[in-house]
Amino acid sequence: MRGLRWRYTRLPSQVEDTLSGEEGNEEEEEEEAAPDPAAAPEDPTVPQLTEASQVLSASEIRQLSFHFPPRVTGHPWSLVFCTSRDGFSLQSLYRRMEGCSGPVLLVLRDQDGQIFGAFSSSAIRLSKGFYGTGETFLFSFSPQLKVFKWTGSNSFFVKGDLDSLMMGSGSGRFGLWLDGDLFRGGSSPCPTFNNEVLARQEQFCIQELEAWLLS
């Protein structure tokens, strides 16, 4: 009896074809998923400034923006007043603020290079008494950002006289005050914000001051 002989014919491997197809698809998917750097959207948390700040760096601007109320997010910053352009005068600051209604960021650098200031829920103006809301806060970069929010103990947010500007008060002390010449100022712990002294010393000299309208 003749032995049976079998002939094996190798058929194309479906597994290999499938794997080969999958590898090709993966390459196509990877190519399609590659991001286009030029099309990357701008970071929505970084506000747009009408001009460069002489006091705040880009990193400091970004850090501060996280502490603003939601109604301010996305609004550009407009430089309403700066001492290098408008001079050292509180009355000039008031004049530049006339007609403004939105919140304001007041930021300054003192003779020691310390950067600090305040966020006011409304424009800075002359007033017979204190005004503002609980959105108002004080801040300091020392060198890391520290923010001092409203404690709820009183409503002494902002008060503007002809010869001084005060923010936060209680027991005869002010969280931040500036004189009429915008040359000298002071900072003390106050009940409104339970803040630390914003500068290295309670009394300081102003080197540069900016007021930004955030609306």
Swiss-Prot record:
Belongs to the OXR1 family. PROSITE patterns: TLDC (PS51886). GO terms for biological process: response to oxidative stress. The gene is TLDC2. The lineage of its organism: Eukaryota, Metazoa, Chordata, Craniata, Vertebrata. Residues 54-215 form the TLDc domain. This is TLD domain-containing protein 2. Signal peptide: none annotated. It comes from Homo sapiens (Human). Residues 1-46 are annotated as: Disordered. GO terms for cellular component: nucleus. Residues 19-34 have a biased composition (Acidic residues). InterPro entries: TLDc_dom (IPR006571). Coiled coil: none annotated.
